[in-house]
């Protein structure tokens, strides 16, 4: 009797563990297939169709291929793989003539990879994560253990941010990824955090192109925003109503204001440098002022939930990219804040993977 593939239930723990181990080497393929799908605009093509259900041939006819018939056969395998990862839904129907017709449509998960009404998505961040420049650095992970090397520096001979300054393509890729991720996170932050109410002025330290402040001021138009970053960064920043772009160096001094934002700044620094930046923030605040740190918080113990997996994954990313960079626990943030002179710290909200941590001067 032939073994049926339908309704298979595997309950043997030893078999399950071995099957998981066999699947581990396949993890690379998901990111690489997603990279190809985004570069080919597959998700956007499906989203823009009138039915939002397309066959591999219908998709292939909309991408720059010389032979849609041949390409659709390869594309079909890509689409089936994505469906197996819950990134597409596979629909199989029979035509009147008895032939099988297969179409694919988006799932809630793949919706995050297409542009929303503001033109943002997770796709640019995935392209950054799978770019050969960063991937090449991963091959030197063992050198961080054996030689104390920074993997990115070992791979490319320079610090990550210095590399971005020399490679306009990579710099553009990085900026686009950060812009999209910031837009997505800040939409949630202004929804879940009310600590900006009643504030007259906000300083965003390392604010890049001013996207975080723009999101805040869109909800609180009476706030004056100062977007503080290096001169070569803010020179390309767009004009926003209510925001002044100020060039400077956070290592020297920070503009004075009642509320200072540090978003995704501390995790790229070692502890000593974190304290230096936090001390400069402390000096720039009035006695009743506060810093709002927006970072991931690493759990004390590794767990298998999404928050834990993302935090420990990004911790590896920081180890690859920066000397002393790391994700930190709540206690580690408290220790840094106290060393810098802050008297009270409170975790007040979460937006996706980022936590909002208030540091009070007095």
UniProtKB/Swiss-Prot annotation:
What's its catalytic activity? Answer: myricetin + S-adenosyl-L-methionine = laricitrin + S-adenosyl-L-homocysteine + H(+); laricitrin + S-adenosyl-L-methionine = syringetin + S-adenosyl-L-homocysteine + H(+); a 3'-hydroxyflavone + S-adenosyl-L-methionine = a 3'-methoxyflavone + S-adenosyl-L-homocysteine + H(+); a 5'-hydroxy-3'-methoxyflavone + S-adenosyl-L-methionine = a 3',5'-dimethoxyflavone + S-adenosyl-L-homocysteine + H(+)
Q: Which Gene3D superfamilies match?
A: Vaccinia Virus protein VP39 (3.40.50.150), Winged helix-like DNA-binding domain superfamily/Winged helix DNA-binding domain (1.10.10.10)
GO MF terms here are: flavone 3'-O-methyltransferase activity; myricetin 3'-O-methyltransferase activity; protein dimerization activity; rhamnetin 3'-O-methyltransferase activity
Active-site residues, as the UniProt record annotates them: 267 (proton acceptor)
Residues binding S-adenosyl-L-methionine: 229
Family matches, as CDD domains: AdoMet_MTases
UniProt keyword annotation of Methyltransferase present: yes
- PANTHER family the UniProt entry points to: O-METHYLTRANSFERASE
Q: What does this protein do?
A: Flavonoid 3'/5'-O-methyltransferase involved in the biosynthesis of polymethoxylated flavonoids natural products such as myricetin derivatives, aroma compounds possessing antioxidant properties and exhibiting pharmacological activities such as anti-carcinogen, anti-viral, anti-thrombotic, anti-diabetic, anti-atherosclerotic, and anti-inflammatory effects. Catalyzes S-adenosylmethionine-dependent regioselective 3'/5'-O-methylation of flavonoids; active on various hydroxylated flavonoid substrates, including myricetin and quercetin, but inactive toward kaempferol.
Annotated family:
Belongs to the class I-like SAM-binding methyltransferase superfamily. Cation-independent O-methyltransferase family.
Q: How does it assemble?
A: Homodimer.
Q: What name appears for this protein in its UniProt entry?
A: Myricetin 3'/5'-O-methyltransferase 1
Q: Which gene holds the coding sequence for this protein?
A: MOMT1
């Amino acid at each position: 009797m032939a073994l049926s593939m339908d309704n298979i239930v595997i309950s043997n723990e030893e078999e399950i563990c071995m099957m998981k181990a066999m699947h581990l080497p396949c993890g690379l393929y998901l990111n690489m297939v997603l990279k190809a799908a985004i570069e080919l605009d597959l998700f956007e093509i499906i989203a823009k169709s009138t039915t939002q259900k397309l066959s591999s041939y219908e998709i292939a006819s909309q991408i720059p291929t010389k032979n849609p018939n041949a390409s659709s056969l390869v594309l079909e395998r890509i689409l089936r793989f994505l469906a197996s990862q819950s990134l597409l839904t596979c629909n199989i129907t029979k035509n009147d003539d008895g032939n099988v017709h297969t179409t694919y449509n988006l799932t809630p998960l793949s919706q995050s990879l297409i542009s929303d009404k503001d033109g943002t998505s997770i796709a640019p961040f995935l392209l950054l994560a799978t770019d050969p420049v960063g991937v090449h650095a991963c091959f030197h992970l063992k050198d961080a253990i054996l030689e104390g090397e920074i993997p990115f520096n070992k791979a490319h001979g320079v610090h990550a941010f210095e590399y971005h300054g020399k490679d306009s393509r990579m710099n553009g890729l990085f900026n686009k990824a950060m812009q999209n991720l910031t837009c997505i996170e800040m939409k949630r932050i202004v929804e879940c955090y009310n600590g900006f109410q009643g504030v007259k002025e906000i300083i965003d330290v390392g604010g890049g192109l001013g996207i975080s402040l723009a999101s805040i001021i869109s909800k609180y138009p009476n706030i004056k925003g100062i977007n503080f970053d290096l001169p070569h960064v803010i020179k390309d920043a767009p004009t926003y109503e209510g925001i002044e772009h100020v060039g400077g160096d956070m290592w020297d001094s920070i503009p004075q204001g009642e509320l200072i934002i540090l978003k995704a700044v501390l995790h790229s620094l070692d502890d000593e440098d974190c304290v230096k930046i936090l001390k400069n923030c402390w000096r720039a605040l009035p006695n009743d002022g506060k810093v709002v740190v927006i970072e991931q918080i690493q759990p004390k113990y590794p767990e298998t939930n999404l928050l834990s997996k993302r935090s420990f994954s990004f911790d590896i990313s920081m180890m690859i990219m920066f000397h002393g960079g790391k994700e930190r626990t709540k206690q580690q943030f408290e220790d840094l804040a106290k060393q810098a002179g802050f008297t009270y710290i409170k975790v007040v909200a979460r937006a996706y993977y980022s936590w909002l941590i208030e540091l009070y001067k007095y």
